[in-house]
Amino acid sequence: MDQSVRRYGARFTGRTAVVTGAASGIGAATAERLAREEAAVVLVDIADERGQAVVDGITKDGGHARYVHADVAAEDDWARIVTAAHDYGPVDVLISNAYTVDVAPAHELSPESWQRQLAVNLTASFLGFKAVLPDLRAHRGAVALTSSVHAHAGIPGHPAYAAAKGALLSLCGQLAVEYGPEVRVNAVLPGPILTGAWDGVTPAERERSIAQTAVRRFGTPEEVAAAIAFLCADEASYITGSRLVVDGGWSVVKDSV
């Protein structure tokens, strides 16, 4: 068993969680973490084979999980997600983690790409929250939105991605104010996390990113998942509208240069 799970115990026993973008990376690690802490987890993605593989791993370890193929930017698909979750029970936890990115400078980015990136990276969080809000209100649920350190610091070739991640922080605060005290809403801001997004990145570029952190290494999806689990657990009952940075000190190193 993961030592952090052993230390904190089963904080989500009897609860149902929905995790989007759950077929890989931070989403998969979060689904696995919540399942190890005894949540029943609905994994949402469009990468069916990978998503089902994560579910199979969870159930093999004795957890409860199922996979739903859905476009999180389509409101009708959220009705199916909620129906699937209700096979376990009302939704207590929503992790809005799905993302997409097209790398191009603003002057080369098509309006269609801009709209799709905002739809998945921003609008999907609104649609998901709206869909599960009745459950969250009734059961004093928790929401975690996956933003990014690039909500605050620009990154070449990512205008729509950065814009959406910045807007997520405003959405986080707005939802926390509007729906407290029944619902808590927080955001995590990962920095350089070693996921499939780094596939194809040159060793030199990787080393440059590592050098920009205070801990001189990449973070892992499991470390972000631990932060998300904390924000959604009862220990964080007095935390809402917050922005938890998980970046190995990347932000402070960048600010000191």
Language model regions located:
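Active-site helix of classical SDR
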Residues: 129, 164, 172
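Short C-terminal tail/terminal secondary-structure segment
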Residues: 2-9, 153, 229, 240-257
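Substrate-binding pocket helix/loop in short-chain dehydrogenase/reductase
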Residues: 105-106, 110-118, 198, 209
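Residue(s) in the substrate-gating loop at a strand-loop-helix junction
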Residues: 148
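Active-site loop immediately N-terminal to the catalytic Tyr-X3-Lys motif
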Residues: 107, 153-159, 216, 234
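Alpha-helical segment proximal to the catalytic Tyr-Lys
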Residues: 134, 176-181, 237
